[in-house]
UniProtKB/Swiss-Prot annotation:
This is 3-dehydroquinate synthase. InterPro entries: Dehydroquinate_synthase, DHQ_synth_AroB, DHQ_synth_fam, DHQS/DOIS_N, DHQS_C. One of its GO terms (molecular function) is 3-dehydroquinate synthase activity. GO terms for cellular component: cytoplasm. NAD(+) binds at G106, V107, I108, G109, D110, T130, T131, K142, K151, F169, F170, A171, T172. PANTHER family: 3-DEHYDROQUINATE SYNTHASE (PTHR43622), 3-DEHYDROQUINATE SYNTHASE, CHLOROPLASTIC (PTHR43622:SF7). Keywords: Amino-acid biosynthesis, Aromatic amino acid biosynthesis, Cobalt, Cytoplasm, Lyase, Metal-binding, NAD, Nucleotide-binding, Zinc. Binds 1 divalent metal cation per subunit. Can use either Co(2+) or Zn(2+).
Length: 365
């Protein structure tokens, strides 16, 4: 089975990825899980309905397994749900020899990792992603919940014991969710690998390709790109910030939409267009943005911007970005495809770029 090793400073662990990953690692994994006092599975309503039976079959021989089913979507990454999960852990009597399994998409991985990092100052956990988007979020140890004023503002760096990535789960993903996750694959290509970007553009030309073409080699390459960056900079003191390409504007947009109007990948797509536009202005980026947007539209992305989204709200939210220091907004831009750089952006430039993308778009947002 394809296996990628993540070598973070705090921990080295495997990422198992293929169409039958759960079954392939079943014996080895359950032997490891049997050493823990209790297995606590955190999932959401949608994943529980569709896939809990499959995980139940894998965990059937373990003596003590407890489930917590969180709400769907970003609602799960709130103080209220976090507190409720903690209450469940305490009431169930989990000790420091317990283990948590985050079984779901990126939201569940973020919440589950943060719960594991903070319960009794830390218990082990496994990531079992079920979405394309989670190929990014499940790897690297960033775990967090949201605050109404900003996405992922309360969090930690806490690595899993392993990531078990069974791509069979993709078959039940709605097209919108597939597209959202694919945006992070595009991001990895833009910041690191022009050849990968061209391969994505040549291979995936319409929405049905998400289901009929093999995503696995592209997911593997994206995970390898992220693993390489995490190995250099686990806690985002330097190059790991490059993984936030498109996220400064994208997270601001998500916050404006109360973390529900746009899926994460949808907001990040707008953010990447915004960052590419600013990169043209600052670095003269040689990139056919019109061709890129046409390709995105063919895949079903909405690439147009709506001037009714108030700039002052976006700017305010951008100031809450984790890269902002001394009230200076940091953008991840590209000097060339595959050559990211951190740039301190003045408010005037942020506004001029905002006006430019608005002129080039219609009523999309």
């Amino acid at each position: 089975m394809p296996e990628i090793t993540v070598r973070a400073k705090s921990k080295t662990y495997p990422v198992y990825i293929n169409e039958f990953a759960l079954e392939d690692v079943r014996e080895k994994w359950t032997e490891s899980l049997a050493k823990f006092s209790h297995v606590f599975v955190l999932t959401d309503e949608h994943v529980a309905e569709l896939h809990q039976a499959k995980l139940d079959a894998v965990l059937a021989d373990l003596p003590v397994v407890t489930y917590y089913v969180a709400p769907n979507g970003e609602e799960a990454k709130t103080f209220r749900v976090y507190e409720d999960v903690m209450t469940k852990l305490i009431e169930t009597g989990l000790d420091r020899k317990a283990v948590l399994i985050a079984f779901g998409g990126g939201v569940i991985g973020d919440l589950g990792g943060f719960v594991a990092a903070t319960y009794m100052r830390g218990i082990p956990f496994y990531q079992v992603p079920t979405t394309v988007l989670a190929h990014d979020s499940a790897v690297g140890g960033k775990v967090a919940i949201n605050h109404p004023l900003g996405k992922n503002m309360i969090g930690n760096f806490y690595q899993p014991e392993a990531v078990i990535y069974d791509t069979q789960f993709f078959a039940t993903l709605p097209e919108r969710e597939m597209r959202s996750g694919f945006a992070e694959m595009i991001k990895h290509a833009l910041i690191s690998d022009q050849t990968l970007l061209r391969a994505l553009m040549d291979t995936f030309t319409e929405p049905k390709d998400f289901y009929t073409k093999d995503l696995t080699p592209f997911l593997q390459r994206g995970i390898e790109i992220k693993a390489n960056i995490v190995a250099q900079d686990e806690t985002e003191q330097g190059v790991r910030a490059y993984l936030n390409f498109g996220h400064t504007f994208g997270h601001a947009l998500e916050a404006y939409g109360n973390f529900g109007k746009w899926l994460h990948g949808e907001a990040i797509t707008y953010g990447m267009i915004y960052a590419l536009t600013m990169s043209e202005t600052i670095y003269g980026l040689d990139f056919d943005l019109a061709e890129f947007k046409t390709w995105l539209k063919q895949l079903g992305y909405d690439t147009t911007f709506d001037a009714t989204v108030p700039f002052n709200k976006i700017l305010e939210n951008m100031r809450h970005d984790k890269k902002t220091t001394f009230n200076e907004i940091s953008m991840v831009l590209l000097e060339e495809i595959g050559e990211p750089v951190i740039f301190k952006a003045e408010d005037d430039l942020i506004f001029e770029t905002y006006k430019r993308v608005m002129r080039n778009g219609g009523n999309g947002i």
